[in-house]
Amino acid sequence: LSLVVGKGVVEWIASRTGEFNCFGTDVGIGWAKHGKIVAGVAYANWNGVNVECHIASDGSRRWLTREYLTTIFDYPFNQIGIRPDGTRYGANRITVVVGEGNTDSNRFVKNLGFELESRLEAAHPTGDLLVYRMFRDRCRFLQVTHEQKLAA
């Protein structure tokens, strides 16, 4: 498996999730096998402290490696922002919004460590939208900071 970054990953995620937009200029990090994307994460609406995350896969679980999970959390929590001096910084939290009827995705984000924050009643074609959050200091996939990696 290999990492893939770019607009193609974002478009693949949009096609898998049925999202009504193409996520604009957002960043996507994918996991590919034999040149075909099997999983991806798109990061949207970064505002300096929070970023939204959209996750999709081909339905398999072979992509769920520690390496990939560390990468998809390291980027938003340690690298997404760039200060005027060129140093990178990350989000304090990630937000994920899932349709209530998507039981697999709801179970998946909970297993990753996201916490249910709120419910948007009748906000999705399948019913309610469930809003999940994860704070940087609660992410179990961040074993070392980005700065520690650079110093090593």
Give residue spans per PLM region.
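Glycine-centered recognition micro-motifs in short, flexible terminal segments and loops
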Residues: 59-71
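Conserved catalytic-core motifs of GNAT/GCN5-like acyltransferases
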Residues: 97, 115-130
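Conserved acetyl-CoA binding element of GNAT-fold acetyltransferases
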Residues: 48-60
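Conserved GNAT acetyl-CoA-binding A-motif
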Residues: 78-98
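Short hydrophobic/aromatic beta-strand element in the GNAT-like acyltransferase core
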Residues: 26-31, 40, 129-131
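Conserved beta-strand in the GNAT
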Residues: 35-45
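Short amphipathic alpha-helix that is part of the acyltransferase structural core
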Residues: 1-19
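Conserved active-site alpha-helix within GNAT-family acetyltransferase domains
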Residues: 101-118
